Regions:
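Alpha-helical scaffold elements adjacent to nucleotide-binding pockets in ATP/GTP-utilizing enzyme cores
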Residues: 1-2, 37, 41, 189-193, ...
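Conserved thiamine diphosphate
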Residues: 8-69, 237, 242
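Thiamine diphosphate
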Residues: 1-21, 27, 79-80, 84-243
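Helix-enriched interaction subdomains in cytosolic or periplasmic regions
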Residues: 47-51, 57-98
Length: 243
């Protein structure tokens, strides 16, 4: 806690610039020891910054921003996205936008845009997600051409609330996707904020989908798949919200 508060309490006189890289996420039947997602725990530590890239280019740009930040930055790295080891994550392999670039902390990106015609007819859904959730959403969106817009948060803290609320107001239907169990999660807090800030623009309650609410991820690969999200589960939830 001292490290996270140092820059703030000293008014910038004692910055603590450090990068803490944390491999996270379920991959390869790691069970309860190596498969957890911890963004909800970390997001309650005031003073630290948290990034969660979904592709290689974002990883580099966010790491460089973290290097220059005067506060501790935790970089969450999903193990299944290393070399796109998990089927359906080919989009994690991207070409660098430039030889030297920095992605500002707290700046989300549109990973997939909905078609203007669908937006004008009120037939779209806004998906807010990050990390592996981006790839589940991208694959699930293939079932609803032009109807899905996906916001890749890239940063857990600071959070790009402006982009979140703008998307919610534009589309009227919102689905928040996380790998964590939903109860008491960071994703659920996003849904609550959207509901509070954008209520008059919503056509349906904000929905959150994540892993089953179990104490730990099973060692069994079969049970692991049953507990975790997948593109198929996300697609089914998209259909429910779209009606």
């Amino acid at each position: 806690t001292e490290v996270s508060r140092s820059c703030y309490l000293s008014n910038g006189k004692w910055p603590v610039s450090c990068i803490i890289r944390v491999p996270v996420g379920a991959y390869g039947s790691g069970g309860p020891y190596h498969s957890s997602s911890v963004e909800s725990v970390l997001s309650n530590i005031r003073g630290i910054k948290i990034v969660y890239p979904s592709n290689g280019a974002d990883m580099k740009g966010l790491m460089k921003a973290a290097y220059h930040d005067p506060n501790p930055v935790v970089v969450l790295e999903h193990k299944g996205l290393y070399w796109s080891k998990v089927k359906g994550t080919e989009a994690a392999k991207v070409v660098e936008p430039d030889g030297d670039y920095i992605i500002p902390l707290g700046k989300a990106r549109i990973a997939l845009a909905a078609s203007k015609d669908r937006v004008d007819h009120g037939q779209t859904l806004f998906v807010v997600t990050y990390g592996m959730g981006v790839h589940w959403a991208l694959n699930a969106a293939k079932n609803y051409p032009g109807q899905i817009e996906i916001l890749d948060l890239r940063c857990i803290a600071p959070l790009d609330e402006e982009a979140i609320y703008a998307g919610a107001e534009k589309h009227g239907r919102v689905l928040v996707v996380t790998e964590e169990p939903v109860n008491s999660s960071f994703a659920q807090s996003i849904a609550a904020r959207i509901q509070q800030q954008c209520f008059k623009f919503l056509d349906a309650p904000v929905t959150t989908i994540g892993a089953a609410n179990l104490p730990a991820i099973p060692l069994s690969e079969v049970l692991e798949r049953e507990m975790l999200l997948s593109a198929e589960k996300v697609a089914a939830e998209m259909g429910k919200v779209l009606g």
